Amino acid sequence: MAIGKRLKKAREGIDRTKLYPLADAIKMIKERAVSKFDETIEVAINLGVDPRHADQMVRGVVMLPNGTGRTLRVGVFARGAKAEEAKAAGADVVGAEDLVEKVQNGNIDFDRCIATPDMMPLVGRLGKVLGPRGMMPNPKIGTVTMDVAGAVKGAKGGSVEFRVEKAGIIQAGVGKASFAEDKLVENIKALADAVVKAKPAGAKGTYVQRVAVSSTMGPGVKVEPGTVLA
């Protein structure tokens, strides 16, 4: 009940039928992020695509200019020199057959997964485990690569993977409530720009249809798409 009352109070002053400029929406969200922890600021982008069709899938990775405020644990599937390269770059978990076995047993001690191309026949066995978690390495988003150092540093430095969900929505954390407003605006615009660049050939009509921002415990605020894409 207390949470319901808090959310109701947080919604005061927000016109749920209105589209706000991005900067105004961020200010409103930050003012209402009053939890004892540093809430994550999240963005939801509704796209004019049907991801059930292969030619309308949208996914990619973007480096947010101001980071995410979150420290990711990175796992790397690699052998030999590439394994050492991953460790030197700051990977938290590095392995080959041994790491595959751990993951198969349900021991997933990382948030982002990277693999060298030669490891994919092994890693492919983990599709049923990593796939539903959105963690399966994929060359299209740079997580199957020989540049393991670059991929690890990117994951640690604020790169965000995005993928359209069944309802045609992309959701991503773009920073913390403690971030300055202009830093959050920059991060959201960087994400939106990457989503636009990832527009599939099969998309018809208006691509970016709706945008909303929210905090972990707070209400959503609808945003004028034009102020995000400008």
Swiss-Prot record:
Quaternary structure and partners: Part of the 50S ribosomal subunit.
HAMAP family assigned to the protein according to its UniProt record, in alphabetical order: Ribosomal_uL1_B
Protein source organism: Bradyrhizobium sp. (strain BTAi1 / ATCC BAA-1182)
Pfam families found in the cross-reference section: Ribosomal_L1
Keywords for the protein's UniProt record, in alphabetical order: Repressor, Ribonucleoprotein, Ribosomal protein, RNA-binding, rRNA-binding, Translation regulation, tRNA-binding
Family stated for the protein in its record: Belongs to the universal ribosomal protein uL1 family.
Function per UniProt: Binds directly to 23S rRNA. The L1 stalk is quite mobile in the ribosome, and is involved in E site tRNA release. Protein L1 is also a translational repressor protein, it controls the translation of the L11 operon by binding to its mRNA.
GO cellular component: cytosolic large ribosomal subunit
Protein name: Large ribosomal subunit protein uL1
Gene (UniProt): rplA
Gene Ontology biological-process annotations: regulation of translation; translation
Coiled coil: none
Record carries keyword Repressor: yes
Domain of life of the native organism: Bacteria
